[in-house]
Amino acid sequence: MGRNGANHSIQTVSEYEPIGEDEERTPLLPQGVQTRGSSFMSSAFNLMNAIMGSGILGLSYAMANTGTVGFSILLLMVASLAAYSIHLLLLLCDKTGINSYEALGEKALNRPGKILVACTILIQNIGAMSSYLFILKTELPAAIIGFMRSDSETSGKWFENGVTLLILVTVIIVLPLALLPKIGFLGYTSSIAFLFMLFFTVVVVVKKWSIPCPLPINSTLSLSLNTSECTAQLFVISSKSAYAVPTMAFSFLCHTAVFPIYCELHRPTKRRMQRATNVSIFLSFVVYLISALFGYLTFYSHVGSELLLAYNTYLPRDILVMSVRLAILLAVLLTVPLIHFPARKAVLMLCRGEREFSWLSHTLSCFFILTLVLLLAIFVPDIKNVFGVVGSTTSTCLLFVYPGMFFLRISSEPIRSFNSVGAVFLLVIGLVVGVLSLSVIIVSWVQGP
């Protein structure tokens, strides 16, 4: 089978002989034209880039509403469930020879399953890309202006216009990266994005000792006398705790990128891909935990849902804070081409099926998707709210529901086996998280700003 394009063909299941569970070093993908694939580290960086996004800014707020120990337990559970759900998907690849999420849906639920998964991936990734571009449109001008000495230097400048900046970065940076035929090429930009996230974490740790506790109550830096505010809570249970669960539940969602990355992995075996997944999830877990912990220990109960805004309040025009703000925006920007790849693959699979790679189809679908998300980011002012409902549903399906359901439908393991019980558990968790996420969003809408 040729693997020289974005739209990988799928081997006929009847022709595939599954490998035994004790032969995890045997290549999972069908043998065909041999080209060197992506390195292990490149694949791991791509997965980490797919995992980490702007959501890292809200994890300190989640810790404030669940407690340090409660947050750590929940984060560990979510990371473990994400790794396990990917394990089930790779196990199905082992058993069937299928190498795409859409094809697993077709195997489990026939053609409606394929369409369902492809549409879910499209909605999820288009929503994520639109939200990321919307963040860039609103935050990038302020991040650039922050480096200027005075407001008079920026008055009337072109970079004050968020739409202009958004179009420029999309055409100059996102489009060339999105046009690349292989997701493995994005390993370099993904490593840069991960370094930006590390930089953010280091700054959060360092700035812990730059802001006094109790926090200043006004611009003259007079201190609040309530020293009890400087005590970390181990466990917190309140109505706001429900808001933290969805944020954490989706913090390890990378499942739409797993299959494209796996298809291009050099010497693709289940063990090798699972190792790449485990490394990515572990490093993301460490970055999440450290940044959330020190962000919380800096502001305690006063931490907001967007961590960097709190630093702007107490450390105005701090060069490190301004730099890390720009770094996070650049990391978000470099994530867009990566999550564009599975969306384009889903479009091509819906429109062209399993035909050979075509540069014309590849380019047209790329322009179509980027134009769509750009228009959504520019002209839909509440795009994050619109995709909040849909995104919570699609994320739940991709992270929990589909892996569990597909395993139960495709696998021949007894229902009482460990993996079957785990698949049922994923289904239940998916339903609970999905209902909770929708409830939180609806309550937020009812209560208003």
Curated annotation (Swiss-Prot):
GO terms for biological process: amino acid transmembrane transport; glutamine transport; sodium ion transport. Residues 1-14 have a biased composition (Polar residues). It comes from the Eukaryota. The gene is slc38a6. One of its GO terms (cellular component) is plasma membrane. Keywords: Amino-acid transport, Cell membrane, Disulfide bond, Glycoprotein, Ion transport, Membrane, Sodium, Sodium transport, Transmembrane, Transmembrane helix, Transport. It comes from Danio rerio. Pfam families: Aa_trans. Residues 1-25 are annotated as: Disordered. Coiled coil: none annotated. The chain crosses the membrane at residues 44-64, 73-93, 115-135, 165-185, 186-206, 242-262, 279-299, 319-339, 363-383, 387-407, 423-443. It is found in: Cell membrane. Belongs to the amino acid/polyamine transporter 2 family. Disulfide bonds join C213-C230. This is Probable sodium-coupled neutral amino acid transporter 6. Probable sodium-dependent amino acid/proton antiporter, could be a neuronal transporter for glutamate.
